[in-house]
Amino acid sequence: MPLLNSVTTPYAEALLQVVNENSQTEEMVSEVKQLLELINNSPELEKALSSPILETDAKKKIINEIFSKKVNSSLLNFLKLLADRQRIGILTSILDRFLEIYRENSNIALATVTSAVELTDEQKGLITKKIINIAGTEKLELVTKIDPSLIGGFVASVGSKVIDASLASQIRKLGLSLSK
């Protein structure tokens, strides 16, 4: 991934600089997340933008038709620039890197919490407070996932730290201690 980061980082930093100059940070972060979700949920779109067969002008036309009413002009121009520079194929990596740099600069930790069932807002709030203390950041961006195999409880990961408070893990530990 370091090689890809060496390509994506300058573009991500340039986008962040434009955003900061125009005081559009929160709006842009929201649009970037929506754009990533749209591309990740549309393999056809990702394939079209990544296609070496499709001409740059055709890609820019697709970008304009799909995104002109969904994103602000700065982001639209950025997408067209990536098409011109033959970098639109790594758009998701560039946008992911943009979000990483934004979080680093804003002291926001990204946490993934996997639970057996959907968490209530109260549970999310309690988990968020605990993770903020562990991560040592001011803010936290929480991504939740559901995995019924956990049986109960949750598994949270922030960076390289993992908190396994799942029932499946406790049962596994109990089984190991009984087998000794």
UniProtKB/Swiss-Prot annotation:
Q: Which GO terms describe its cellular component?
A: plasma membrane-derived thylakoid membrane; proton-transporting ATP synthase complex
Q: Which UniProt keywords apply?
A: ATP synthesis, CF(1), Hydrogen ion transport, Ion transport, Membrane, Thylakoid, Transport
Q: Function, please? A: F(1)F(0) ATP synthase produces ATP from ADP in the presence of a proton or sodium gradient. F-type ATPases consist of two structural domains, F(1) containing the extramembraneous catalytic core and F(0) containing the membrane proton channel, linked together by a central stalk and a peripheral stalk. During catalysis, ATP synthesis in the catalytic domain of F(1) is coupled via a rotary mechanism of the central stalk subunits to proton translocation. This protein is part of the stalk that links CF(0) to CF(1). It either transmits conformational changes from CF(0) to CF(1) or is implicated in proton conduction.
Does the keyword DNA repair belong to this entry? no
In the bilayer, the protein is annotated as:
Peripheral membrane protein
List cystine links.
none
The protein's GO terms of the molecular function aspect are:
proton-transporting ATP synthase activity, rotational mechanism
- Record's subcellular location: Cellular thylakoid membrane
Family note = Belongs to the ATPase delta chain family.
Name of the protein described by the UniProt record: ATP synthase subunit delta
Give the chief site where it resides: membrane
> What does the subunit comment say?
F-type ATPases have 2 components, F(1) - the catalytic core - and F(0) - the membrane proton channel. F(1) has five subunits: alpha(3), beta(3), gamma(1), delta(1), epsilon(1). CF(0) has four main subunits: a(1), b(1), b'(1) and c(10-14). The alpha and beta chains form an alternating ring which encloses part of the gamma chain. F(1) is attached to F(0) by a central stalk formed by the gamma and epsilon chains, while a peripheral stalk is formed by the delta, b and b' chains.
Pfam family of the protein (one): OSCP
